[in-house]
């Protein structure tokens, strides 16, 4: 299948998916502009703003919240565990990105289109078609973090299994641990 045919097929598929939004259908009916063109224009303006870094931080955080919030609410309402795992993993990865963004000024110095790249990455993470969050979890987070989580959980369970010290035993051990004055 040629590239041109695939693009037309994907655009038709997107147009069919956009038909589920009554606001876009109403806009198309009232103004005679295809909902697909309205969507693509809005996406293009959004990408331009990110490329020029006009409100990049806010725009990517809105993207990181809005679409996943919708899918997360749907996941909460279903009994399917797979979609819950997808969104928990997504939030784990985006939280890690937020930690990295502490150094955002330094990142923007070396990667001026960081916000645009982050938006593309967030879309890849969030869309079930790509399953990006699960890929990141399986290949980056799980192999390096899970052994530490298991060790921490064992330590916490040992602490919870041990009897809690009373105030008098704490005072006694503290008093005996104090070295004599010189």
From Swiss-Prot:
This is Protein yop1. The gene is yop1. Its main location: endoplasmic reticulum. It comes from Schizosaccharomyces pombe (strain 972 / ATCC 24843) (Fission yeast). The keyword Iron-sulfur does not apply. GO terms for biological process: cell division; endoplasmic reticulum organization; endoplasmic reticulum tubular network membrane organization. Oligomer. Interacts with RTN1 and TTS1. Residues 55-56, 103-105 are lumenal. Residues 1-34, 76-85, 125-182 are cytoplasmic. One of its GO terms (molecular function) is membrane bending activity. It is a multi-pass membrane protein. The short lumenal loops between transmembrane domains 1 and 2 and between transmembrane domains 3 and 4 may impart a wedge-like configuration, thus deforming membranes. Belongs to the DP1 family. Required to generate and maintain the structure of the tubular endoplasmic reticulum network and the vacuole. Induces high curvature in membranes and causes membrane tubule formation. Involved in membrane/vesicle trafficking. Required for the correct positioning of the cellular division plane by delimiting the actomyosin ring assembly at the cell equator. The chain crosses the membrane at residues 35-54, 57-75, 86-102, 106-124. One of its GO terms (cellular component) is cortical endoplasmic reticulum. It comes from the Eukaryota. InterPro entries: TB2_DP1_HVA22. PANTHER family: HVA22-LIKE PROTEINS (PTHR12300), RECEPTOR EXPRESSION-ENHANCING PROTEIN (PTHR12300:SF161). Keywords: Cell cycle, Cell division, Endoplasmic reticulum, Membrane, Nucleus, Transmembrane, Transmembrane helix. It is found in: Endoplasmic reticulum membrane; Nucleus membrane.
